[in-house]
């Protein structure tokens, strides 16, 4: 295994050169010290330190140290018990059951005696660990030690002498015998060391020129051991280079009708999938990659000029190292600076070209952006229930699959709850669709989505939609008529997606199912028919905003904030209960779900198809190219499927019928709201507590339990008596709900003041972090590129859901605007301008105007029925509009209010602005037409940042 080490003296400004050196050396193991600057210590973002293709182990105490192990090598983080700040450790299994313990250490030249003693103790501890091989690299800052004689002239009991003594007591071997630190014409010293527990462990130690302005050489060497390489072969299809004309001709020549007649749906699917995959292999170029070699290609920006400058830099340094002459040092500095300039120029030119082609090739642009701004980390070693560490990918996959299966519900088939009869206008027993309907669905597929377990690419289906619509229509029709899915459609590949918490714990991941794209296409037909049936029969609860056309997170939050502000304005305190289902999507009992669908009038072949969709499913988990064994799916609706979320919505649809409080739903996200009653103040049973008891009984009957430890209460109002609420856990024990002072709900932070200053602070901080990452990651920052990056990556953090939390405090307005102010100053050619002029030069509206515009768009959508909600609750129309001779026909009612919170909800703050808009704007025929008309009418406000100016028309 090849290893590389250097003292980098700040990572972010040398990353480009470091990647160049990594491409040149191709190391399996990388050790770095001083990865962050003295000024920015503790402020480095985790993504900043990522190197594609490597697993990183980082300790950012003081100046920081880092270890990088190639992804194809199994590695495990090791935590020492000795409290020495700047070290990082991991272990690698080797062949023949050997193991390698690797450490990187940084000892400051200003280290205290205690810190030096701790470092010596740490080394002793690691030597005593049960590993056959030990390798420690780092900057130890002991120029006083002569490593050729392993002696020092330093006084007895001094740090160098103590280190040497400990080194000999541990029977270590030090391999660096030439200077590693050159600062001008000062004396060169050996500061960087490589320590091992065997004399012949390393070979071909090479000293090369520093990276950037660092004074430390780069060391690379061969470790004489063989790591356990996890080679995974993956076949990649280059779908952008496919011969789709040839593929269409190939597929058109197949007599689909005769091939698919009088056979089972399983046989039909085998015929269709086999032919599509055969056509893919024939007409789409592909290549098989091995994970061990997949990251060895050079950076795309590296060109011949860069390579030539690097070569000159190497030659100049070699000459200086031999002569130590001042002239040669100056020539080296000049060559170093020219190489760095050439690299920057190459990166800048590449980024400029990427930006130019962003419109014609947005995929390439965002791939590059994501490579700079997102951390692509593999799943680390997991901690098993027994405390043991799980390192093998197949074993990890088994752990995940066992955990995901452990939450399945064992349904009580002996006792089913009673369901009240529901009057209905129609029943859903069959679905009619044509080949044209199937073709339209195929043409609307997202080509960038992943294929399912069958490996059929969405791009193939989209390109060949017209010809494949015929066989798929035959298959879909037969599947529906028989009420049976092809068996392959019921097999899911599960990808664990990290949520939050420790990455080493399996319960901190959620399962996402990758299923057949063709199956998802048919699911859309069933989903749309089911939703249409539920809405037409007025079965769907008005409180549900998730996965329903014309409703969203924003519409749900607008309703609850409007109700809270109404209660506050009327002088009432209120309480919110944030409910949390336990593994909601995975624990839905199948037979109870089918029972509910029957009660809603779903029957015939549609019900049988859904029954087949739910039952007899199985899943396996993939981790790093390794697969778990198959396990049966006993309950739940597949996360990642098209139909699953709607089935869940149907399952909990009756929950609001049993309670008196206001309830707000978004799929499995549920909140209860009610004003504080006189009974509560007097110590009696409140409406909320009664509803919680009812919901506990409902969850017990329908076997969909609440995670009571995550259910919380928020008390709103200055004189709120802060009552305690309880719920029963799965074992029937009462549990007092925790009080929360701030809660992130559907992406928006809510606090008892309902002024949203907390959300504004979170949004501004997140946007600022991303802005800093963009600033550090991109060399080329002209107006076009930065505007694209800002609009795509930063502004969404400042605007998500702003119709809900529209700030009205001056400090909050300024806090948000400062982020955009700071972003526009990053463009060198615009820094001299004032903020408003920069906005005009970039054609970038102020955030204050964007929020006002967003309010108007929300109002337009409500009044023109783009939302399937009653607009009179939030935005009541002026009933006298028809009698007025002035203004437009959609004027809003002006209502009185007492509190600033009430005055700032959408239905109050937008009234004057909306009512003063001309009729041709508010009656636009589409949302896009409204946006264009509004922007033209309000062009003079586009760059305004002062709130009072925004209300002028």
Specify the residue positions occupied by each region the protein language model found.
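Active-site palm subdomain of RNA-directed nucleic acid polymerases
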Residues: 126-135, 526-544, 569, 645-675
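Short, conserved micro-motifs composed of acidic
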Residues: 47, 179-200, 205-207, 625, ...
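Surface-exposed loop/turn segments and immediately adjacent short secondary-structure elements
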Residues: 222, 226-228, 252, 257-260, ...
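Metal-dependent phosphoesterases centered on the DNase I-like endonuclease/exonuclease/phosphatase
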Residues: 20-60, 117-199, 249-263, 268-270, ...
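Conserved pre-catalytic core of RNA-dependent polymerases
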Residues: 404, 430-638, 674, 787, ...
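Non-catalytic, peripheral interaction segments enriched in hydrophobic/basic residues
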Residues: 288-289, 295, 342, 351-358, ...
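Arg/Lys-enriched, amphipathic patches
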Residues: 100-103, 133-137, 141-151, 222-391, ...
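Short phosphate/oxyanion-binding micro-motifs
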Residues: 1-131, 154-155, 162-163, 167-170, ...
């Amino acid at each position: 295994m090849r290893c590389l080490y250097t003292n980098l003296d700040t990572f972010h400004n040398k990353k480009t050169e470091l990647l160049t050196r990594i491409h040149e050396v191709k190391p399996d193991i990388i050790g770095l010290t001083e990865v962050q600057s003295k000024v920015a210590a503790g402020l480095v973002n985790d993504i900043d330190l990522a190197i594609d293709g490597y697993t990183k182990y980082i300790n950012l105490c003081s100046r920081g140290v880092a270890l990088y192990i190639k992804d194809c090598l199994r590695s495990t983080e090791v935590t020492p018990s000795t409290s020495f700040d700047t070290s990082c450790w991991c272990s690698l299994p080797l062949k023949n059951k050997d193991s390698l313990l690797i450490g990187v250490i940084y000892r400051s030249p200003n280290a205290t005696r205690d810190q030096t003693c701790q470092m010596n103790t740490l080394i002793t501890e690691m030597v005593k660990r049960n590993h056959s091989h030990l390798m420690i690299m780092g900057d130890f800052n002991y120029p006083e030690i002569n490593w050729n004689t392993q002696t020092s002239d330093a006084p007895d009991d001094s740090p160098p002498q103590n280190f040497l003594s400990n080194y000999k007591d541990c029977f270590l071997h030090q391999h660096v015998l030439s200077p590693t630190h050159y600062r001008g014409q000062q004396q060169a010293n050996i500061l960087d060391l490589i320590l091992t527990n065997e004399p012949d462990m390393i070979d071909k130690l090479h000293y090369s020129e520093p990276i950037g302005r660092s004074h430390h050489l780069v060391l690379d060497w061969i470790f004489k051991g063989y790591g356990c390489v996890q080679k995974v072969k993956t076949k990649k299809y280059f779908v952008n280079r496919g011969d789709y004309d040839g593929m269409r001709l190939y597929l058109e020549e197949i007599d689909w009708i005769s091939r698919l007649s009088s056979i089972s749906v399983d046989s039909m699917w085998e015929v269709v999938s086999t032919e599509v995959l055969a056509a893919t292999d024939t007409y789409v170029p592909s290549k098989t990659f091995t994970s061990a070699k997949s990251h060895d290609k050079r950076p795309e920006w590296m060109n011949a000029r860069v390579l030539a400058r690097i070569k000159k830099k190497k030659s100049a340094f070699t000459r200086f190292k031999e002569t130590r002459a001042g002239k040669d040092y100056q020539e080296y500095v000049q060559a170093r600076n020219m190489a760095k300039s050439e690299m920057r120029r190459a990166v800048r030119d590449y980024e400029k070209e990427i930006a130019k082609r962003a419109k014609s090739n947005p995929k390439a642009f965002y791939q590059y952006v994501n490579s700079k701004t997102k951390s692509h980390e593999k799943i680390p070693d997991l901690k098993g229930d027994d405390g043991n560490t799980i390192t093998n990918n197949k074993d990890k996959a088994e752990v995940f699959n066992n955990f995901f299966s452990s939450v399945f519900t064992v349904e009580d088939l002996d006792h089913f709850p009673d369901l009240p009869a529901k009057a209905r206008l129609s029943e859903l027993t069959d679905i009619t669709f044509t080949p044209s309907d199937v073709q339209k669905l195929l043409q609307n597929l997202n080509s960038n989505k992943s294929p399912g377990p069958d490996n059929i690419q969405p791009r193939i289906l989209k390109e060949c939609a017209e010809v494949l619509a015929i066989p798929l229509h035959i298959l879909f029709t037969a599947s529906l008529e028989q009420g049976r899915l092809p068996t392959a459609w019921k097999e899911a590949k599960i990808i664990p997606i990290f949520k939050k918490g420790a990455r080493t714990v399996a319960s901190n991941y959620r399962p996402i199912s990758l299923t057949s794209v063709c199956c998802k296409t048919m699911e859309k037909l069933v989903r749309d028919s089911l939703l249409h049936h539920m809405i037409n029969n007025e079965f769907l609860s008005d409180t549900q905003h998730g996965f329903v056309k014309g409703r969203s997170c924003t519409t749900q939050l607008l309703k609850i904030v409007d109700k809270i502000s109404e209660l506050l304005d009327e002088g009432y305190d209120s309480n919110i209960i944030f409910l949390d289902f336990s593994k909601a999507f995975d624990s839905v009992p199948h037979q109870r779900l089918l029972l509910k669908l029957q009660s809603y009038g779903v029957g015939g072949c549609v019900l049988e198809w859904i029954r087949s969709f739910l039952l007899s499913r199985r899943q396996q988990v993939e981790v790093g190219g390794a697969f778990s064994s198959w396990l049966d799916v006993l309950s739940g609706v597949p996360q990642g499927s098209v139909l699953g979320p709607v089935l869940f919505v149907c399952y909990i649809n009756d929950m609001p019928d049993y309670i008196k409080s206001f309830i707000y739903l978004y799929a499995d996200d549920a909140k209860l709201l009610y004003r504080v009653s006189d009974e509560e103040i007097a110590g009696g049973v409140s409406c909320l507590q009664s509803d919680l008891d009812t919901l506990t009984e409902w969850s017990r009957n329908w076997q969909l339990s609440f995670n009571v430890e995550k259910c919380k209460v928020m008390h709103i109002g200055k004189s709120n008596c802060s009552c305690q609420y309880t719920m029963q856990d799965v074992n029937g024990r009462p549990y007092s709900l925790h009080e929360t002072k701030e809660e992130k709900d559907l992406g928006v932070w809510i606090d008892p003041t309902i002024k949203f200053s907390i959300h504004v602070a979170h949004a501004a901080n997140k946007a600022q972090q991303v802005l800093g990452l963009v600033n550090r990651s991109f060399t080329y920052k002209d107006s076009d590129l930065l505007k694209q990056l800002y609009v795509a990556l930063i502004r969404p953090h400042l605007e998500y859901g702003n119709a809900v939390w529209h700030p009205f405090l001056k400090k909050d307005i300024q806090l948000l605007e400062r982020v955009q102010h700071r972003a526009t100053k990053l463009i060198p050619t615009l820094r001299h301008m004032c903020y408003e002029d920069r906005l005009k030069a970039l054609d970038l509206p102020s955030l204050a105007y964007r929020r006002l515009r967003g309010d108007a768009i929300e109002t337009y959508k409500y009044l023109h029925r783009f939302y399937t909600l009653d607009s009179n609750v939030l935005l009541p129309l002026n009933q006298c509009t028809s009698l007025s001779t002035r203004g437009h026909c959609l004027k809003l009612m002006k209502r009185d209010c007492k509190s600033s919170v009430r005055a700032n909800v959408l239905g109050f703050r937008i009234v004057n602005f909306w009512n003063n808009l001309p009729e041709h704007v508010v009656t636009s025929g589409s949302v896009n037409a409204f946006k264009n008309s509004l922007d033209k009418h309000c062009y003079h406000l586009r760059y305004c940042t002062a709130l009072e100016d925004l209300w002028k028309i």
